[in-house]
């Protein structure tokens, strides 16, 4: 029985690390460093987010940042779903998990990877824990995890912000 618990803990730990380190890949820092050859954190508000990047460099490069931030969220959730679909803590090929049990593992893995992807975006260990605000990453994750919740959240955001 303890093996089953430790297998689940280890698998969740791998998913959490995967989500966090994918989140640490901040799109605005990567684009400003490798394409523009500058550091976005040295300008305007000093934040490594999309808003500061847009204010500093304009819309042309901001689309690359949007793509990077959305792709890292998609990658974190997709890899977590892939790992969750292959995860069976019992290691019994004769008695596989039911579809409901497997779907529950996949859902839990996706939520944990997504949450830690946002945490990695906001507090990246690669940038002295100074990251973005996590808005675009969170919006992408809500769309990936449940489109109905994303629709409600985005509508409220549009009404309150605009």
What residue ranges belong to the model's regions?
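Interfacial segments of multi-pass membrane proteins
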Residues: 54-58, 116, 120, 134-162
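N-terminal signal-anchor transmembrane alpha helix
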Residues: 10-36
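N-terminal membrane topogenic signal
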Residues: 1-11
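Helix-boundary and loop/linker segments of multi-pass membrane transporters
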Residues: 4-6, 51-56, 102-104, 130
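Nucleotide and nucleotide-moiety/phosphate-recognizing core
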Residues: 11, 15, 61-65, 71-126, ...
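Transmembrane helix boundary and interhelical junction motifs in multipass membrane proteins
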Residues: 24-30, 129-137
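Cytosolic, membrane-interface loops and tails of multi-pass inner-membrane proteins
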Residues: 29-62, 131
